[in-house]
A protein has these predicted regions:
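Long, hydrophobic, well-ordered secondary-structure blocks that form the structural core
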Residues: 1-16
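C-terminal catalytic domain of Rieske-type non-heme iron oxygenases
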Residues: 13-235
Length: 235
């Protein structure tokens, strides 16, 4: 009786497009998230980037997915874990901006290192920007470099296993080995090593959570706030 009805329909998900990239959401969004970044990223012309299969990577990490996100959002470790990246970035000019469902980290280049050619109307005009690192809750990371875009998709497998998909979209192939985005494989493996060590250390009897750095861990704090709000609704 009354079959089929609207109750039998397949579920429709909200879909949006920004500069050739398609996004699907299981929840209704008040406004497209990219509207907040028009001034920052519109000049890039991402729709003209070329998908480069040589930059495709699939990583399996022996750690919880939230530790991977923590590490991505925390600039504190750069001088200690990433010597090559630290050589390209002016650490004193590394900044973090938070918003409702994400975090933007901005890395300035050291003198002589490759940086974006920013238009005069850009909010960062006058600065030597080496990279923009954008995280959208819960598991999307967009890394913008002068050569193009590297996307990280973080997929939880189990409490102690995480899959990370790397995808690359190239604007200028001559710059792929230059600056902050010049050796992503090395940076990724350095990150994985420290993430797995942190995961193991959290099982120690003497482990206790530390305090947040007010200048280097604003992104981590924002991530934890989002997670906490979700848990509060479930209780």
């Amino acid at each position: 009786v009354d079959f089929p009805s609207v109750l039998d329909d397949l579920h429709e998900f909200e879909m949006g497009t920004w500069q050739g990239l398609n996004f699907v959401s299981q929840q209704t969004n008040k406004s497209p998230i990219w509207e907040e970044f028009v001034e920052r990223f519109e000049f890039l012309g991402v729709e003209n980037y070329v998908h480069d299969l040589s930059k495709k990577r699939d990583h399996l990490i022996e750690a919880n997915w939230m530790l991977y996100v923590d590490n991505y959002l925390e600039g504190f470790h750069i001088p200690f874990v990433h010597p090559e990246l630290n050589d390209a970035l002016d650490y004193s000019g590394y900044t973090t901006e938070v918003f409702e469902n994400g975090v933007l980290q901005v890395g300035e280049a050291k003198e002589g290192e490759i940086s974006f050619d920013l238009p005069e109307t850009h909010p960062d005009f006058g600065k030597q920007i080496a990279a923009y690192y954008l995280w959208l809750f819960p598991n999307m990371m967009f890394n913008f470099y002068p050569w193009g875009l590297s996307v990280n998709i973080v997929i939880p497998i189990s409490p102690d296993k995480t899959r990370v998909l790397y995808r690359g979209y190239v604007k200028n192939s001559e710059l792929t080995e230059e600056g902050a985005g010049g050796d992503l494989d090395t940076v990724e493996l350095q990150d994985q090593d420290i993430i797995e060590k942190v995961h193991k250390s959290m099982y120690s009897k003497i482990y206790d959570r530390g305090r947040y750095s007010p200048t280097r861990e604003q992104g981590v704090h924002q991530f934890h706030r989002i997670i906490s709000k979700i848990y509060e609704k479930l209780v």
